[in-house]
Amino acid sequence: PCFLAGVSAATAFSLSRALPLIELTHQQGHISAALFAASGADLFGKEELVFHVSGGTTDLLHCKGPDSITCIGTSSDLYAGQAVDRLGVRLGYAFPAGIYVSQLAAACTENIKPKVSVRGTTCSLSGLQNQCEKLLAEGKSPEYVSKYCLLCVAETLRRMAAAALERNPGLPVVFAGGVMSSEIVRDYITKRMQYAYFVPGKFASDNAIGVSILVAREINAWPNTSM
């Protein structure tokens, strides 16, 4: 319903100003913002794998730029952002709690081996919430459990990417979405994967810049103009 309200407002504005209405999807905007942040105009029109990881998605997408998008992997239950936020709330922080979980995790210096559930490009994250609860019950510190949670997310994505790259060797992998702003996730993956691109939070948290790029491209104003 929130997206339909936006369509109605855009339609009314375009009619009142005699302007063309360019319809795009929410996910196209996020992918466009991610590709732009990762490599400017270079990845547009090329094949790549894109992770969109947030409180509402843990999707692995096979893209040919933002115009051709195929979902080739996802979670069978809980999304990564949900697992992180639920841990943060469990530790007493306000929702959304991802930033607090990241701060706690950064303070943990212990070596941790994550345990994950991945089959091919499909993951299950419901067990992660139970694992975090068990660790807290065993007396592990909030810092330890937060780091464990984020490393589980990172290892899950790494394994999904590895499975996808077996079928699509050599493709770059772009990681976008709020959860990907975690330095722990970024460091873990980049040390274990080549051609991994991470999107800065300012481009990942809102897809407005991606929508703007797509509209500019539609009217041939980008990448011909500086941005």
Where are these regions (language model features)?
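Active-site metal-binding loops of divalent metal-dependent hydrolases
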Residues: 56, 177-179, 201
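Glycine-rich phosphate-binding/hydrolytic loop that grips phosphoryl groups
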Residues: 30-33, 199-227
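Conserved phosphate-binding catalytic cores of ATP/NTP-utilizing and phosphoryl-transfer enzymes
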Residues: 24-49, 213-214
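Conserved phosphate-binding/catalytic loops in two-lobed NTP-binding clefts
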Residues: 23-24, 173, 190-211
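A contiguous, well-structured pocket-lining segment that forms one wall/lid of small-molecule binding clefts
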Residues: 102-173, 179-197, 216-226
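Short glycine-aspartate micro-motif
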Residues: 2, 48-52, 174
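A short helix-loop
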Residues: 44-46, 51-54, 59-140, 219-227
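Short beta-strand-loop/turn "lid" adjacent to the catalytic site in phosphate-handling enzymes
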Residues: 1-11, 15
